[in-house]
Amino acid sequence: MPRAVNGTIHKNRRRRVLKDAKGFRGARSKLYRTAKSAVMKAGQWAYRDRRAKKRDFRKLWIIRINAAARENGLSYSVFMNSLKKLGINMDRKSLAELAFNDREVFNALVEKIKVAG
């Protein structure tokens, strides 16, 4: 019995890889062998960047909080330390949201810190 080379499992695997490579440039979206390596590499980058995204957003939040705090005469570290001392448990994401979109509330927090300390 001859060897089957056009089986459904084989075709489905190749079709899935080429589907995942859709939108890639040149041969990376057309040829199975290059598409397979491109999809593998894209998966590695996606895995790495899902973790890096968390670090990047935390950095962005800190930058926004620091900028808003410095407009009111406080550094980021003094601002965060004072919040902890006052027992105000807000995460950096929500503080950055206040600093970026609702400056009046953020300024009220700063005034509360200045009155207390």
Swiss-Prot record:
Gene3D superfamilies: 6.10.160.10, Ribosomal protein L20 (1.10.1900.20). GO terms for cellular component: ribonucleoprotein complex; ribosome. Keywords: Ribonucleoprotein, Ribosomal protein, RNA-binding, rRNA-binding. CDD domains: Ribosomal_L20. InterPro entries: Ribosomal_bL20, RIBOSOMAL_L20_CS, Ribosomal_protein_bL20_C. GO terms for molecular function: rRNA binding; structural constituent of ribosome. It comes from the Bacteria. GO terms for biological process: ribosomal large subunit assembly; translation. PANTHER family: 39S RIBOSOMAL PROTEIN L20 (PTHR10986). Binds directly to 23S ribosomal RNA and is necessary for the in vitro assembly process of the 50S ribosomal subunit. It is not involved in the protein synthesizing functions of that subunit. NCBIfam families: rplT_bact. Belongs to the bacterial ribosomal protein bL20 family. HAMAP family: Ribosomal_bL20 (MF_00382). This is Large ribosomal subunit protein bL20. It comes from Leptospira borgpetersenii serovar Hardjo-bovis (strain JB197).
